[in-house]
A protein has these predicted regions:
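N-terminal, polar/Ser/Thr-rich
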Residues: 1-9
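Short, hydrophobic/aromatic beta-strand segments
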Residues: 9, 22-29, 40-41, 132-134, ...
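Short Pro-Gly-centered flexible turn/kink motifs
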Residues: 10, 113-122
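Asparagine-centered strand-capping/turn motif at beta-strand->loop junctions
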Residues: 16-20
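Surface-exposed, glycine/proline- and aromatic-rich loop segments on solvent-exposed faces
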Residues: 23-56
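Extended, low-hydrophobicity, Ser/Thr/Pro/Gly-biased non-transmembrane segments
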Residues: 53, 60-90, 97, 123-232
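Short strand-edge motifs at loop-to-beta-strand transitions and within beta-strands
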Residues: 102-106, 118, 223
Length: 232
């Protein structure tokens, strides 16, 4: 995470189990941050409904009348959110991935048979948007980064099929899983995250075991926080 530009990059490995009786030839991911861009489906919805979320609009005067204008509509390039994917592979073989708004559609290199496993790997780059709803940067409480749904998130597949719905500020429907996450960020930032901090005695900031003193070398510029979150 670059705390000056609010941009971040990473890589993801996902071991996917097909618990269904169906053979899967495609998979879908959510790219939620892409909703926070002018012209997105969420932006269009805000502009077209009568009662938009008050957090997502500005009140402006047009011809002497007060109207509600989408905050997303006016975001500048360094204020938007985005999530971009590259180098998508299935078991080491390149698969075809296509981004459509907040959804990534992947045509698999090989089908996933019922009750079998496969491994997906990918690289991603993102930018944290100005806070519009629950996530974003520089919120009113003084939190620098409120990170929710910030990574490429596999969509849910169940008896109804794929739940690859575009994000328009409605509720989430996701997959339960075991997460192992490493986040490298400026050493002056204190993180909170789901699960357990595995390297607390390297991080300090009050997370360390009682009696442990954590002293960082003066040349240290960043820290890598290692979280493990089972079944979330």
């Amino acid at each position: 995470m670059d705390v000056k530009t609010y941009q971040y990059k990473g890589n993801q490995e996902l071991v996917y189990t097909n618990n269904s009786p169906d053979t899967l030839r495609k998979v879908y991911y959510h790219l939620f941050n892409n909703a926070f861009q002018p012209g997105s489906e969420m932006d269009a919805r805000i502009q077209s409904i009568k009662d938009p979320d008050s957090r997502m609009v500005n009140k402006v005067k047009v011809d002497g009348k007060e109207v509600k204008e989408s905050r997303i509509k006016t975001l500048k390039p360094n204020e938007i959110g985005y999530l971009r994917i590259s180098n998508f592979k299935q078991d080491g073989v390149v698969a075809t991935a296509k981004e459509v708004g907040t959804i990534l559609e992947v045509t698999l290199a090989k089908p996933i048979l019922p009750h079998s496993k496969t491994t997906f790997t990918l690289n991603f780059e993102g930018q944290v948007p100005i806070q519009i709803r629950r996530s974003g940067r520089n919120n009113a409480e003084g939190i620098e980064l409120s990170m929710t749904q910030w990574f490429p998130k596999i969509a849910e597949f169940d008896f109804e099929g794929w739940h690859a719905d575009p994000y328009i500020a409605r509720e989430f429907h996701g997959v339960w899983g075991n997460f192992d996450v490493k986040i490298t960020i400026d050493k002056n930032y204190i993180l909170g995250g789901s699960g357990y901090l595995l390297n607390k005695n390297e991080i300090g900031y009050g997370y360390q075991d009682e009696g442990v003193v954590v002293t960082l070398p003066k040349k240290t510029k960043t820290l890598t926080w290692h979280f493990n979150a089972p079944m979330v």
